[in-house]
């Protein structure tokens, strides 16, 4: 599975955890709503377990892809250097490893921040859902199960909108993971090529993407 697919699985697990707790008790009653607020700690523990299960795997897959792209970028310069009969100085591979390691750590940090944001977002969504379900049931607009079914349907369509960018656009976790991975792979390929050119003493050369 790709990093984005693993994050999607994580999002699904978190939503499933919320649904499981919402379905417990006399749905929509005042006591039920109070119970849901009291279950935030339980939800947090369940979601932390889901994150521990899938986020580490997602980080590993993202780091693999990033390293692969970096080495592909370096290989393009190596091929050019062979044509020009240039030799790679000693220690160049170690420097490349350091560069790729830096990008790998940066990616892990981004994904870990994403996991923390998902936890906070799940808490807010759960509380909001319990309030909405309670209000609908008390008003007689829907039964408890109807209100939950509508809530779940909305989550299925929209996902867990946990991230907002500078333009105010909202992103699901898997979409955000794709953005992180795409951006980092583009950067690591470029920086790996620059690093290799520096090692060979090459000026900027035109490279097809």
Model region roles, listed by residue range:
Residues 1-167:
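N-terminal leader/targeting and assembly helices and adjacent pre-domain segments
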Residues 154-157, 161-209:
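Acidic, glycine-rich two-metal-ion catalytic cores of nucleic acid-processing enzymes
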């Amino acid at each position: 599975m790709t990093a984005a697919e693993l994050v999607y699985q994580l999002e699904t697990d978190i939503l499933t955890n919320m649904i499981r707790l919402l379905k417990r008790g006399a749905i929509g009653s005042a006591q039920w709503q109070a119970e849901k607020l009291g279950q935030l700690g339980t939800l947090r523990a369940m979601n932390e377990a889901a994150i521990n299960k899938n986020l580490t795997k997602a980080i590993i897959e993202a780091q693999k892809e990033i390293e692969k792209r970096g080495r592909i970028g370096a290989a393009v310069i190596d091929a050019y250097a062979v044509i020009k009969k240039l030799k790679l100085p000693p220690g160049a591979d170690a420097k490349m490893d350091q560069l790729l390691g830096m990008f790998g750590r940066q990616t892990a940090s981004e994904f870990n921040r994403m996991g923390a944001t998902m936890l906070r977002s799940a808490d807010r969504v759960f509380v909001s859902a319990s309030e909405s379900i309670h209000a609908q049931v008390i008003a007689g607009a829907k039964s408890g199960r109807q209100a939950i079914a509508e809530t779940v349907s909305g989550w299925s369509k929209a996902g867990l909108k946990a991230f907002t960018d500078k333009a105010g656009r909202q992103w699901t976790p898997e979409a955000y993971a794709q953005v992180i991975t795409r951006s980092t792979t583009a950067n690591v390929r470029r920086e790996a090529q620059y690093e290799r050119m520096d090692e060979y003493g090459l000026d900027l050369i035109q490279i097809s993407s």
